[in-house]
Amino acid sequence: MLFIFDRPGRYAFWMKGMKFPLDFIWISGDKITEITGKVGIDQMNLRPQQPVDKILEVNSSWAAEHQIKIGDTVKYESVSN
């Protein structure tokens, strides 16, 4: 799931109600600034080190399996209903 914010910030995320771990990919502009891998179901108040305007949640270990790295450029397209 991709979260897009109007302005950069150090937004807090937590895993309430999740039944499986995730990776958090923190994005500023079009660059990955941080990756928090294997976020457990009991973790609360996760924040990036620096302000971001997007956060991508993916299945645990997905980032490593796909060789996603800090500094990588992110491209995405809008999807209409």
For each predicted feature, which ranges?
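Compact, glycine-rich, soluble single-domain proteins
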Residues: 1-81
